[in-house]
A protein has these predicted regions:
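Hydrophobic beta-strand residues in large extracellular and virion-surface proteins
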Residues: 54-56, 98, 114, 184, ...
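Signature of long, low-cysteine stretches enriched in small and polar/charged residues
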Residues: 20-22, 31-37, 44, 73-119, ...
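Bacterial Sec-dependent N-terminal signal peptides
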Residues: 1-19, 300
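Surface-exposed amphipathic alpha-helical segments
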Residues: 16, 25-26, 32-38, 125-173, ...
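Short, well-ordered beta-strand elements
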Residues: 54-57, 121-131, 200-203, 264, ...
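Secretory pathway targeting signatures of secreted, lumenal, and periplasmic proteins
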Residues: 19-69, 107, 164-222, 255-258
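Surface-exposed flexible segments
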Residues: 63-79, 135-146, 196-208, 285-301
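Long, acidic/polar, low-complexity amphipathic helices and coiled-coil-like
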Residues: 44-54, 94, 99-145, 149
Length: 303
């Protein structure tokens, strides 16, 4: 799952700040890289003319789980080449560092990745830049080394995105922010600990993508979800939310424990190069949660 964090390549940017900046959606502050602006679709910074970026991701899991997944073999399966790995002392903690290469659209990108945390939290700082942009790479690495984690700082996840939902009148409670997406669950925890495993997520595209047939694209995206080989689409219906057209899919499938689950899936297309995506899942009370998922989706709005 973590490997999908590396695939976004096209970004926008511009700015210079000489003081620590709290990165929205995280508990981290850092010196913004020179010539970069705050990203609009993820937690971090981006630069337009080079396609470079720094992304910070916080995950509610033991950081060694993430470290152990960064093997040459697993990265290679995602088209990533591990060049080297090391450790460094980072704000009093041990950080695992990785130097990775990836080719996309005939361009080779270098990636510098820091992973640190504790037995309950993993923080991943991912810097990416074209191989030929060595000066930009030095700026990114310097900025990455300035990251400071403060658990008492509010994550401000809702401020990190340009959309909003209102769960009032539903069983869903805001549970957190992850990689540009707002998360909701029945118990307000991430990951959820409720027996029904009911969750709802809303996010957006990271970069431009050519979309010729929005219906076909929606179907292809639901079929790309984890364990989608057992997913059966029950209905697919045109939908308009906040004056943005798209499609709603109701499906049934299985989770990683092979338990049956309801899948509610919505994609909205403001144009042919971007989208907003909403996903609701539950292992029980299908009719009740389907009603809640639909009600929550209908509150989607842009800020």
């Amino acid at each position: 799952i973590l490997l999908i964090l590396f695939v976004s390549i096209n970004f926008y940017v511009h700015a210079q700040v000489d003081s620590l900046f709290q990165v929205p959606g995280t508990h981290c502050s850092m010196l913004p890289p020179k010539g970069f602006d705050k990203a609009e679709t993820f937690s971090g910074f981006q630069q337009p003319n080079t396609g470079s970026s720094i992304m910070i991701t916080e995950l509610p899991t033991n950081y060694m789980v993430i470290v152990n997944s960064f093997t040459a073999e697993s990265l290679a399966k995602a088209g990533l080449l591990l060049m080297s790995s090391d450790t460094l002392i980072f704000n009093g903690m041990t950080a695992y560092t990785y130097y990775i290469k990836q080719k996309a659209n005939e361009v080779t990108f270098n990636k510098q990745v820091f992973i640190f945390g504790n037995n309950q939290l993993a923080v991943m700082v991912n810097g990416m830049y074209p191989e030929k942009e060595t000066a930009v790479g030095e700026i990114i690495l310097s900025s990455m080394k300035s990251v400071i984690y403060n658990e008492t700082t509010a994550e401000n996840g809702k401020e990190a995105v340009k959309f909003a939902l209102d769960p009032t009148g539903t069983s869903m409670i805001y549970s957190g922010y992850l990689s540009g997406a707002l998360m909701y669950s029945q118990d307000g925890k991430m990951p959820t600990q409720s027996a029904d495993k009911a969750v709802f997520t809303v996010g957006s595209s990271f970069s431009s993508v050519a979309i010729d047939d929005t219906k076909a694209y929606t179907e292809s995206r639901i079929k790309s979800l984890p364990y989608a080989e057992k997913t059966v689409i029950k209905t697919i219906t045109p939908v308009t939310i906040y004056n943005i057209n798209g499609y709603e899919i109701v499906a049934e499938g299985s989770d990683k424990e092979n338990q049956q689950q309801l899948i509610y899936f919505v994609m909205l297309y403001p144009d042919n190069t971007s989208y907003y995506i909403m996903l609701g899942m539950t292992n029980a009370k299908y009719e009740s949660y389907l009603s809640d998922f639909r009600k929550l989706a209908q509150t989607f709005m842009l800020k």
